[in-house]
């Protein structure tokens, strides 16, 4: 029954994508003198302005996975920008390099915000975007970043974190968070243990944030990435694993979340 449901969702998405005229465009922009290389996607057949969504990449860097998610958002009727948080489009091809690149940005929130906000400006300037309706989604490292930007008080309608770590050195303060928050995490993700989830909930409650946390039982880290199992085997990281059910359900939750925060039907 579940396989049948997943197939129906996939077919519906494929049909919608076929009707859309999704365009993709590489863009270069700057933050603090560093060249950043992003990717914009939008439905060229759609008339009028629409919400804009930033896509923040995994710890591997701005790659095809982030671009594919941007195109998927465009097919839903949004204009999406897959940003570059590392600079010059740098990508990591080994976990050691990915960890260092991620740490350099994660541990410097001033730098992270500078590069994130540069992406917001690019997105807002696109002629298809209603610059008052901006959200952000992030995967793994990207999930960390969107939550940190929400904690910093960025003026976003909402953020969605997919299998991102929830710990922070700068907890949200009451009245500071403007964005609504959606956290989608795996119940078998050792990088986001149950105690971390509970700590995050306490943080959000204390700061009076409008948030929701959904845990997918049995889902490992990177459960949305179809290459997760291959990467896990390649680098002997048992924590990685794709989960088709959690992938489909979390994407559907994000769509419902966007309908709510943008107050319009998609």
Language model features with spans:
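Serine-hydrolase catalytic machinery in alpha/beta-hydrolase-like enzymes
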Residues: 26-126, 226-240
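C-terminal catalytic histidine-bearing segment of alpha/beta-hydrolase fold enzymes
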Residues: 39, 205, 210-266
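Short alpha-helix in the alpha/beta-hydrolase fold that links the catalytic acid
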Residues: 69, 193-203
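Alpha/beta-hydrolase fold nucleophile elbow
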Residues: 127-139
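Gly/Ala-rich beta-loop-alpha elbow adjacent to hydrolase catalytic centers
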Residues: 138-142, 146
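A conserved short beta-strand
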Residues: 155-165
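Short beta-strand/loop motif that positions the catalytic acidic residue
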Residues: 177, 183-185
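Acidic catalytic loop of the alpha/beta-hydrolase fold
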Residues: 188-192, 221
């Amino acid at each position: 029954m579940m396989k049948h449901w997943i197939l129906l969702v996939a077919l519906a998405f494929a049909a919608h994508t076929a009707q859309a005229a999704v365009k993709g465009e590489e863009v270069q922009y700057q933050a603090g003198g560093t060249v950043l290389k992003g990717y914009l996607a939008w439905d060229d057949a759609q008339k009028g302005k629409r919400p804009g969504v930033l896509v923040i990449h995994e710890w591997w860097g701005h790659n095809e996975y982030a671009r594919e998610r941007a195109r998927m958002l465009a097919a839903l009727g949004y204009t999406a920008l897959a940003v570059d948080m590392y600079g010059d489009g740098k990508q990591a091809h080994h976990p050691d390099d990915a960890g260092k690149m991620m740490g350099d940005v994660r541990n410097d929130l001033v730098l992270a915000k500078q590069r994130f906000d540069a992406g917001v400006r690019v997105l807002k300037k696109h002629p298809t975007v209603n610059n008052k309706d901006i959200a952000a989604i992030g995967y793994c490292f990207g999930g960390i970043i969107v939550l940190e930007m929400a904690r910093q008080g960025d003026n976003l309608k909402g953020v969605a974190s997919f299998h991102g770590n929830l710990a922070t050195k700068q907890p949200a303060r009451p009245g500071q968070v403007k964005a609504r928050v959606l956290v989608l995490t795996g119940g078998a993700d050792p990088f986001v243990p149950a105690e971390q989830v509970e700590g995050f909930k306490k943080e959000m409650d204390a700061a009076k944030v409008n948030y929701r946390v959904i845990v997918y039982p049995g889902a490992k880290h990177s459960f949305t990435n179809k290459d997760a199992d291959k990467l896990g085997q390649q680098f002997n990281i048992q924590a990685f694993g794709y989960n088709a059910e959690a992938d489909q359900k979390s994407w559907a939750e994000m769509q419902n979340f966007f309908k709510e925060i943008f107050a319009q039907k998609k």
